[in-house]
């Protein structure tokens, strides 16, 4: 099963990605983790990504796409994966579609974790991260709405909405139901 997780910062995608991957026996692929691992290993892509991250810039889509494409070549991803944090734009979604088409496959499901902005603010402020000020959080939500929300329209035929308010286990049960598991 090939599953994408979408939702604003603080919706619980990372937590649910780990649980879903474990339950379904497929890898969780997080672009943040891909960046970290490639940087640590000093790969060509990692060195290039580090230049952008060190400058405080977003890693360009073509480089992110290349990292994801490279990761999808690993044998553990042959039977499926949970993608967390990618794609972030329609441009990246189209690139992902091409990657999967070359492999003769496609996305099976797209889960959107939905949470009100009030709940997100509370969750993010509760994490205690230095950069989680109200202004920064509100800006991240705006960026999500502007950049990532168009993906909801792009994936409308595969999209399943998951109410992400509740305990970790309640949200996990809803996510499994949305996947028909």
Swiss-Prot record:
Stretch list, region LID: 126-132
- Activity regulation per the record? Competitively inhibited by the bisubstrate analog Ap5A, by 7-deazaadenosine 5'-monophosphate (TuMP) and 8-bromo-AMP.
Which pathway or pathways does this protein act in? Purine metabolism; AMP biosynthesis via salvage pathway; AMP from ADP: step 1/1
Coarse class of the protein's main subcellular location: cytoplasm
What does the record give as EC number? 2.7.4.3
- Localization of this protein: Cytoplasm
Q: Does the keyword NADP apply?
A: no
Q: Where is this cross-link: Isoglutamyl lysine isopeptide (Lys-Gln) (interchain with Q-Cter in protein Pup)?
A: 94
* Keyword annotations of the record: ATP-binding, Cytoplasm, Isopeptide bond, Kinase, Nucleotide biosynthesis, Nucleotide-binding, Transferase, Ubl conjugation
- GO MF annotations, alphabetized: adenylate kinase activity; ATP binding; nucleoside diphosphate kinase activity
Which residue intervals make up region (NMP)?
30-59
Which reactions does this protein catalyse? AMP + ATP = 2 ADP
Matches recorded under CDD domains: ADK
The free-text temperature note is: Optimum temperature is 50-55 degrees Celsius. Highly thermostable. Is half-inactivated at about 67 degrees Celsius.
Q: Which Pfam families match?
A: ADK (PF00406)
Binding annotation for ATP: 10-15, 127, 166
Q: How does it assemble?
A: Monomer.
Domain topic, free-text comment: Consists of three domains, a large central CORE domain and two small peripheral domains, NMPbind and LID, which undergo movements during catalysis. The LID domain closes over the site of phosphoryl transfer upon ATP binding. Assembling and dissambling the active center during each catalytic cycle provides an effective means to prevent ATP hydrolysis. The LID domain is a solvent-exposed domain that is much shorter in Mycobacterium than in many other bacteria like E.coli.
| General function of this protein | Catalyzes the reversible transfer of the terminal phosphate group between ATP and AMP. Plays an important role in cellular energy homeostasis and in adenine nucleotide metabolism. Has a broad specificity for nucleoside triphosphates, being highly active with ATP or dATP as phosphate donors, and less active with GTP or UTP.
User: What family name appears in the similarity comment?
Assistant: Belongs to the adenylate kinase family.
From the Swiss-Prot or TrEMBL record, give the protein name. Answer: Adenylate kinase
Can you name the source organism? Mycobacterium tuberculosis (strain ATCC 25618 / H37Rv)
């Amino acid at each position: 099963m090939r599953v994408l997780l979408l939702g604003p910062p603080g919706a619980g995608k990372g937590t649910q990605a780990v649980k879903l991957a474990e339950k379904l026996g497929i890898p969780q692929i997080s672009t943040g983790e891909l960046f970290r691992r490639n940087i640590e290993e000093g790969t060509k892509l990692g060195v290039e990504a580090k230049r952008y991250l060190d400058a405080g810039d977003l890693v360009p889509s073509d480089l992110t796409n290349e990292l994801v494409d490279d990761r999808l070549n690993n044998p553990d991803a042959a039977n499926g994966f949970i993608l967390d944090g990618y794609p972030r734009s329609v441009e990246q979604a189209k690139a992902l579609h091409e990657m999967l088409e070359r492999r003769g496959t496609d996305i099976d499901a797209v889960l959107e974790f939905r949470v009100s902005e009030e709940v997100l603010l509370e969750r993010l402020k509760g994490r205690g991260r230095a950069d989680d000020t109200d202004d920064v959080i509100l800006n991240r939500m705006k960026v999500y709405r502007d950049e990532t929300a168009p993906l909801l329209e792009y994936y409308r035929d595969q999209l399943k909405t998951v109410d992400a308010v509740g305990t970790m286990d309640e949200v996990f049960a809803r996510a499994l139901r949305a996947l028909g598991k």
